[in-house]
C-alpha cells in the first residue's frame, strides 16, 4: 500500500486544485440566492447518505473493515464526476457544482466526524493514539481546502485562459482519478479480489438505493426535474480519491479501501457508458 499512500495526497490535491479552477464566487452566492435545492441536496448527501450506508452494513453484516470502508466512501462529498454526469443527464450543472464545492469544504469537518463515530459504533479500538479527528481534519484541509482556494485565486487572475481550457483540466482530473485506482488494483490486486464480491455488492446497493431515495426526496422538495437529477447523482457519485486518502491516513489494512476500489470500478464503467451514449446521440 506504500505507492498508494504516497500518490493519493498528491493526486487529491491536484484534483481539488482542478475543482477550484472551475469555481467562482458565483457558485457560492448561488447557494444564498437559491437555498431550497441546495439545502435538500446537502442534507441528502451529508446526513442521509451515511445513515443509509450504516443501515446497509448492518443488514449485510459486513466485516468491520469493509463496513468502515463503506462508511468512508459514504462520508466523502460529491466528486467532479458528478458534475460531468449531471451534464450528460441534462441536470442542473450549476447546482451540482455548488453542492460539490460546498460539500468539499465542509468535508474537512464532516468526514473525520462520520468516520471516527462509525469506528466507535463498530467497535474498532485499534486506532493509533497518534491518529485523531483533529489531525485528520488538518491534513484534509491541506489537500482539500487549500488547493480549492488556490485554484479560485488562479482563476480570478486568469479567468479567460482557465475558462477556455477547463475541459483539459477536467480530463486531467479524470486521469488522476484513474491513476490512483489503477495503483490500488496493481499493488493490492490479490487482497482486493478476495473481498471484491462482498464490497462490490454493498457499494452497488448503496448507490442504487441512495440515488433512488434522493431522487424521490428531491421530487417532493426541489424545484424541478433537472434539480432532482442533480441531487440524485450527487448522492451516488462521491469523491473516491478523498476516500482513499482518508483510508490510507487512518488504516494500514487494504481491506478498508476495497469498497472505494469497487466504487471506482462502478463509477468509471458508468461514466464511460454515459459518455458513449451521449456521443452516439
Each language-model region and where it sits:
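Generic transmembrane alpha-helix signature in multi-pass membrane proteins
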Residues: 53-57, 69-72, 80-93, 97-100, ...
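Mid-bilayer segments of alpha-helical transmembrane spans in multi-pass integral membrane proteins
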Residues: 79-83, 104-117, 139-148
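Hydrophobic transmembrane alpha-helices of secondary-active transporters
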Residues: 8-30, 48-53, 73-81, 145-155, ...
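Entry/N-cap segments of selected transmembrane alpha helices
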Residues: 27-57, 187-218, 256-266
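The feature identifies polytopic integral membrane transport proteins across all domains of life
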Residues: 37-42, 63-75, 92-101, 133, ...
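Juxtamembrane helix-boundary/capping and inter-helix hinge elements in multi-pass membrane proteins
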Residues: 26, 33-37, 61-65, 86-95, ...
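Conserved small/polar residues in nucleotide/adenosyl-binding loops
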Residues: 271-280
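Small-residue-rich segments of transmembrane alpha-helices in multi-pass membrane proteins
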Residues: 40-51, 102-116, 170-183, 233-245
Amino acid at each position: 500500500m506504500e505507492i498508494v499512500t504516497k500518490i493519493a495526497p498528491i493526486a487529491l490535491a491536484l484534483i481539488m486544485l482542478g475543482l477550484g479552477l472551475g469555481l467562482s464566487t458565483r457558485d457560492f452566492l448561488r447557494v444564498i440566492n437559491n437555498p431550497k435545492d441546495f439545502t435538500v441536496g446537502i442534507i441528502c448527501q451529508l446526513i442521509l447518505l451515511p445513515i443509509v450506508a450504516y443501515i446497509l452494513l448492518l443488514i449485510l453484516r459486513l466485516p468491520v473493515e469493509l463496513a468502515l470502508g463503506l462508511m468512508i466512501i459514504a462520508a466523502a462529498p460529491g466528486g467532479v464526476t458528478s458534475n460531468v454526469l449531471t451534464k450528460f443527464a441534462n441536470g442542473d450543472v450549476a447546482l451540482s457544482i455548488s453542492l460539490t464545492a460546498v460539500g468539499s469544504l465542509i468535508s474537512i469537518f464532516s468526514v473525520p466526524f462520520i468516520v471516527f463515530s462509525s469506528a466507535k459504533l463498530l467497535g474498532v479500538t485499534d486506532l493509533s493514539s497518534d491518529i485523531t479527528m483533529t489531525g485528520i481534519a488538518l491534513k484534509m484541509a491541506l489537500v482539500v481546502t487549500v488547493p480549492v482556494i488556490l485554484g479560485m485565486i488562479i482563476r480570478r487572475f486568469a479567468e479567460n485562459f482557465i475558462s477556455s481550457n477547463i475541459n483539459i483540466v477536467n480530463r486531467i482530473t479524470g486521469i488522476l482519478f484513474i491513476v490512483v485506482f489503477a495503483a490500488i488494483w496493481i499493488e493490492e490486486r490479490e487482497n482486493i479480489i478476495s473481498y471484491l464480491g462482498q464490497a462490490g455488492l454493498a457499494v452497488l446497493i448503496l448507490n442504487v438505493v441512495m440515488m433512488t431515495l434522493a431522487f424521490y426526496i428531491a421530487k417532493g422538495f426541489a424545484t424541478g426535474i433537472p434539480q432532482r437529477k442533480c441531487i440524485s447523482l450527487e448522492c451516488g457519485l462521491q469523491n473516491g480519491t478523498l476516500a482513499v486518502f482518508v483510508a490510507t491516513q487512518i488504516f494500514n489494512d487494504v481491506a478498508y479501501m476495497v469498497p472505494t476500489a469497487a466504487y471506482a470500478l462502478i463509477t468509471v464503467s458508468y461514466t464511460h457508458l454515459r459518455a458513449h451514449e451521449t456521443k452516439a446521440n
